Amino acid sequence: MIPYVKMMPYVNEYDTPECKTLAETAKKSIRTPESLGLDRCIQCGACTASCPAARFTDYSPRQIVKKVLENDRSVLESEMIWSCFYCYSCNLRCPRNNSPVTIVQVLRQMAINEGIRVEKLAYFLEIGEHLGENGASKVPGAGIKNMEKDLGERWIGIKRKLEPIRSELGLSARDVRNTHGEVQAILESTGYFEREKWIKARVQEKGIRGFLKTDRTGTSCTEKKKNSGDLGFESDREYTGQEALTV
């Protein structure tokens, strides 16, 4: 654990329970199914062989599982656990029903709780601020526009018929009038706002710029405002040019 960093507030004991070993924490996490085959791992490498990230990086689900079984806590500070993008191919291919992707999720949260690699959360600050202020996440405008290009009139037709489609599926009409207050109540009760303050403080300590609201206002970047879709989202906020971190 990094000594000068205060642990994240509202650490969920069910998410990362305090145990003697990494393996026990992974197995007892609320994220983990009872059928997890961690102790049955035979290090066959099927997980790494099927992993898309392993083809282009040094990421190895097999090595991560090995470190967890050996209780090697250096894995919490490893860049490797941030290369997974949760496709679950490793879980699908494992002959022992292990789930390296689930283990990685637990390891990431453990690292964050201890103030390790907090910069990986910087990119998500804007999304979190938007959710807290407006009760909704950001709209992936670029993705929608690309779908229009790929699918043409078919996609436009789907958009126009969205409400009839919802009706056919038995879904209620969209009503977001009270969403903001409800979302804020959930965020408040779960300690989200305290976590957000903690993350912002760590980001500022590390000198990471371009992700806090104060970084995006009152600067010369107004002349270079990014268009909708540069980061895959529509936004009316201003950026300093700092690109998103890959997590």
From Swiss-Prot:
<comment type="similarity">
    <text>Belongs to the HdrC family.</text>
</comment>
<keyword id="KW-0560">Oxidoreductase</keyword>
<keyword id="KW-0411">Iron-sulfur</keyword>
<feature type="binding site">
    <location>
        <position position="47"/>
    </location>
    <ligand>
        <name>[4Fe-4S] cluster 1</name>
    </ligand>
</feature>
<dbReference type="InterPro" id="IPR017896">
    <property type="entry name" value="4Fe4S_Fe-S-bd"/>
</dbReference>
<feature type="binding site">
    <location>
        <position position="90"/>
    </location>
    <ligand>
        <name>[4Fe-4S] cluster 2</name>
    </ligand>
</feature>
<dbReference type="GO" id="GO:0015948">
    <property type="term" value="P:methanogenesis"/>
</dbReference>
<keyword id="KW-0004">4Fe-4S</keyword>
<keyword id="KW-0479">Metal-binding</keyword>
<dbReference type="GO" id="GO:0046872">
    <property type="term" value="F:metal ion binding"/>
</dbReference>
<comment type="function">
    <text>Part of a complex that catalyzes the reversible reduction of CoM-S-S-CoB to the thiol-coenzymes H-S-CoM (coenzyme M) and H-S-CoB (coenzyme B). Probably involved in methylotrophic methanogenesis but not in aceticlastic methanogenesis.</text>
</comment>
<feature type="binding site">
    <location>
        <position position="87"/>
    </location>
    <ligand>
        <name>[4Fe-4S] cluster 2</name>
    </ligand>
</feature>
<feature type="compositionally biased region" description="Basic and acidic residues">
    <location>
        <begin position="216"/>
        <end position="240"/>
    </location>
</feature>
<comment type="subunit">
    <text>The ferredoxin:CoB-CoM heterodisulfide reductase is composed of three subunits; HdrA1, HdrB1 and HdrC1.</text>
</comment>
<dbReference type="GO" id="GO:0016491">
    <property type="term" value="F:oxidoreductase activity"/>
</dbReference>
<dbReference type="InterPro" id="IPR017900">
    <property type="entry name" value="4Fe4S_Fe_S_CS"/>
</dbReference>
<dbReference type="GO" id="GO:0005737">
    <property type="term" value="C:cytoplasm"/>
</dbReference>
<protein>
    <recommendedName>
        <fullName>Ferredoxin:CoB-CoM heterodisulfide reductase subunit C</fullName>
        <ecNumber>1.8.7.3</ecNumber>
    </recommendedName>
</protein>
<feature type="domain" description="4Fe-4S ferredoxin-type">
    <location>
        <begin position="32"/>
        <end position="62"/>
    </location>
</feature>
<feature type="binding site">
    <location>
        <position position="44"/>
    </location>
    <ligand>
        <name>[4Fe-4S] cluster 1</name>
    </ligand>
</feature>
<feature type="binding site">
    <location>
        <position position="41"/>
    </location>
    <ligand>
        <name>[4Fe-4S] cluster 1</name>
    </ligand>
</feature>
<keyword id="KW-0484">Methanogenesis</keyword>
<dbReference type="Pfam" id="PF13183">
    <property type="entry name" value="Fer4_8"/>
</dbReference>
<keyword id="KW-0408">Iron</keyword>
<comment type="pathway">
    <text>Cofactor metabolism; coenzyme M-coenzyme B heterodisulfide reduction; coenzyme B and coenzyme M from coenzyme M-coenzyme B heterodisulfide: step 1/1.</text>
</comment>
<feature type="binding site">
    <location>
        <position position="51"/>
    </location>
    <ligand>
        <name>[4Fe-4S] cluster 2</name>
    </ligand>
</feature>
<feature type="binding site">
    <location>
        <position position="94"/>
    </location>
    <ligand>
        <name>[4Fe-4S] cluster 1</name>
    </ligand>
</feature>
<dbReference type="InterPro" id="IPR051460">
    <property type="entry name" value="HdrC_iron-sulfur_subunit"/>
</dbReference>
<feature type="binding site">
    <location>
        <position position="84"/>
    </location>
    <ligand>
        <name>[4Fe-4S] cluster 2</name>
    </ligand>
</feature>
<keyword id="KW-0963">Cytoplasm</keyword>
<dbReference type="InterPro" id="IPR009051">
    <property type="entry name" value="Helical_ferredxn"/>
</dbReference>
<dbReference type="GO" id="GO:0051539">
    <property type="term" value="F:4 iron, 4 sulfur cluster binding"/>
</dbReference>
<dbReference type="InterPro" id="IPR053646">
    <property type="entry name" value="HdrC_heterodisulfide_reductase"/>
</dbReference>
<feature type="region of interest" description="Disordered">
    <location>
        <begin position="216"/>
        <end position="247"/>
    </location>
</feature>
